[in-house]
Amino acid sequence: MNSSIHVMLEVLQERAEKGEEFEIFDVFQRLTMDVITKTAFGIQTDVQKNSKSSLLAATKLIFRTNYNDAVIFIGLAFPLLRKVCLRLQVLIITLLNKGRPPHTMLRAGIKKVIQMRKSIPQAKKNDLLQLMLDSSIVTDTSEMDISKLEAGNTEMEKSVQGEITNKKSRMMSEAEIVASAFAVLLAGYETTSTALAYTAYLLAKHQDVQDNLLQEIKELIERGQKLEYATVNKLPYLDKVLSESMRIHPPVHLFTNRYALEDVQYGDIHIPKGMLIQAPVHLMHHDPEFWSEPEIFDPERFSSKPNTDGVTYLPFGVGPRNCLGMRFAQLEAKLAIAHTINKFCIKLGEKQKDELNILCRLRTLTPKGVYIRLEARNENT
């Protein structure tokens, strides 16, 4: 992760030396793609400095789908048509990619790495992909009836114990690994880069917050510590800045959803079994009932964290099915922002004087562009 961030800093240094404004969302997209391919799959890419990266182009195309696209809207409104609409949407994306399905291209690349790992023992690496290749799935060969248990009945306990041990394990299939790796690739790329772009915009717009964050970073460095895993998690103001950024601009707006497991009567509303319930994350993050002056960017509102223990703050979902990569994403975002602010002062570009133009994608709320200028900081300040 650190090596990828240092490459990003080189890219930003070149931009700062030119003195021109540029679109930073693309820079962060390249960073997160580089990080996820290295850490999850052990793949070295040139995506950060290669303007014609086929990997990035294919991934961007997958996320091009808008929430209000007719095909997607119909699929969401009519569950019985969802599979048909999904296939139609894949066809549309394939046509936009000159007949090459980007999903297939990415899966083929992952499959190639898997086959290399299996055929060449020396190719093994300490990463997520290798963990999946070495892992096994436990499956039941019988059903266990917990109701058999009675206090003090040792015969029944032995019977149930026999059923518990009557299991077998199998390795994950290649198809399962490819599907899981594909999901990790996409999840690790889009959401974190979106959060970073929004944070850069807010820091450029609120120079006082940027100055406070720089002061916290400088104090850490003056104590002889480096910006790394063990230290960025000890920067409370940085944590507040990122938390407030994701409150105002939650990257994911349709992540927290659940199917009703049974019929529920919620006040005057009847929720039948099987109905999909989606939490309006952006709306909840801007509800004045939960947040005082919700449209104001104020990192200090997270000093006491009054709302984060409930279900009014959902950038990573909630409950046992929340985002599995939450800690990874938070660490990546903290390192990227801390290093960037330490090296550069972020200012809004002329193209970004107006409010952000936000695109409502299928799962994410992404900025159409975040134009900024960078000024290199004096090493002695």
Regions of interest found by a model, annotated:
Residues T364-T381:
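C-terminal helix/juxtamembrane-tail motif
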Residues F182, A187, G267, S303-A333, ...:
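Cytochrome P450 heme-thiolate "Cys pocket" and heme-binding signature region
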Residues F22, N97-G99, S119-A123, L186, ...:
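Conserved, non-catalytic sequence blocks in retroelement Pol enzymes and Pol-derived host proteins
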